Amino acid sequence: MAQIFNFSSGPAMLPAEVLKQAQQELRDWNGLGTSVMEVSHRGKEFIQVAEEAEKDFRDLLNVPSNYKVLFCHGGGRGQFAAVPLNILGDKTTADYVDAGYWAASAIKEAKKYCTPNVFDAKVTVDGLRAVKPMREWQLSDNAAYMHYCPNETIDGIAIDETPDFGKDVVVAADFSSTILSRPIDVSRYGVIYAGAQKNIGPAGLTIVIVREDLLGKANIACPSILDYSILNDNGSMFNTPPTFAWYLSGLVFKWLRANGGVAEMDKINQQKAELLYGVIDNSDFYRNDVAKANRSRMNVPFQLADSALDKLFLEESFAAGLHALKGHRVVGGMRASIYNAMPLEGVKALTDFMVEFERRHG
């Protein structure tokens, strides 16, 4: 079978080695004669899976001991509600920085629970889309927390700065599309959350990192399965968790550790991004309209100079084993999502195709 490279924004490509192991273990896991999908989440075998996954995840991100790691349902959209329901306490407002589609979605959900103070960080610089630097973000004095999204998958916009707003500002961040792709200083955040389906594992699992002093403040109306304290007190097993997604994510963590960890992923991701953006920038046939300082290394949107060729580009790229390159309906064009599991050879195959396509149709 020819090599297929999946550039989907999520559910996204998974490491081939991980899929092979899961395939081998699917019907007989750990010699039990059953699938990991069939064993009890409270049995000792799965408890070991859960504990190892948390330990490996903590090690990969150097999560401090005063932070809890929760394995949850609900995805990023679930956390759009969970953050205000857990962190507001007796306050009625929170700061939200709008830099793109997902930040705006979080703001829309937060309005059900508080009065967000919204700061529009979007700006145009020399005709290119960009984000104002953090030093220009206008935060309020009475906010329970400040929320932002470091990587906008649809817009292809990244905020790579490390937040430094002082110890009194609780920073909450949606890391769904950039978690584990580069080192981060977890201690600068109060809450970090990430849906698994981009850089962690299969859809269905959400990971939350929360500073322990923020627990115990949930709104009385907060659903139990979104209550950080209840999840923590029950080892993320207040209800039946998505066991297969948890297991497979644990395999991804071990794959990451075996391949140099987050620091090595950071280097490889930089190489992949430079290769792809290099082809775009050195061509009049392709374009990307994001300022270089805010370009995402995970999600690279690009347009063809002649949009009439879009359909042909997608058909021919798919036939060449380059799948899921169609851009989001909001922005159109193309989008290549190049998360950790996308090897450098996959990006090389894409750029070779782009150069050849331009030669034939430019």
From Swiss-Prot:
Keyword tRNA processing belongs to the record: no
Transmembrane intervals: none
Tagged with keyword Plastid: no
Residues the entry annotates as binding pyridoxal 5'-phosphate: G76, R77, W102, T153, D174, Q197, N239, T240
Modification type N6-(pyridoxal phosphate)lysine: residues: K198
CDD domains from the UniProt entry: PSAT_like
Binding residue positions for L-glutamate: S9, R42
Cell compartment(s), UniProt: Cytoplasm
Root EC class: transferase
Catalyzed reactions per annotation: O-phospho-L-serine + 2-oxoglutarate = 3-phosphooxypyruvate + L-glutamate; 4-(phosphooxy)-L-threonine + 2-oxoglutarate = (R)-3-hydroxy-2-oxo-4-phosphooxybutanoate + L-glutamate
GO BP field: L-serine biosynthetic process; pyridoxine biosynthetic process
GO terms under cellular component: cytoplasm
Gene Ontology MF terms: O-phospho-L-serine:2-oxoglutarate aminotransferase activity; pyridoxal phosphate binding
Major location (coarse): cytoplasm
UniProt-listed Pfam families: Aminotran_5
Cofactor note: Binds 1 pyridoxal phosphate per subunit.
Keywords, ordered alphabetically: Amino-acid biosynthesis, Aminotransferase, Cytoplasm, Pyridoxal phosphate, Pyridoxine biosynthesis, Serine biosynthesis, Transferase
InterPro entries recorded: Aminotrans_V_dom, Aminotrans_V_PyrdxlP_BS, Pser_aminoTfrase, PyrdxlP-dep_Trfase, PyrdxlP-dep_Trfase_major, PyrdxlP-dep_Trfase_small
Pathway(s) of this molecule: Amino-acid biosynthesis; L-serine biosynthesis; L-serine from 3-phospho-D-glycerate: step 2/3; Cofactor biosynthesis; pyridoxine 5'-phosphate biosynthesis; pyridoxine 5'-phosphate from D-erythrose 4-phosphate: step 3/5
Cofactor(s) demanded: pyridoxal 5'-phosphate
Protein EC: 2.6.1.52
Function: Catalyzes the reversible conversion of 3-phosphohydroxypyruvate to phosphoserine and of 3-hydroxy-2-oxo-4-phosphonooxybutanoate to phosphohydroxythreonine.
Assembly mode: Homodimer.
Entry's family note: Belongs to the class-V pyridoxal-phosphate-dependent aminotransferase family. SerC subfamily.
Protein name, as recorded: Phosphoserine aminotransferase
Gene that this polypeptide is encoded by: serC
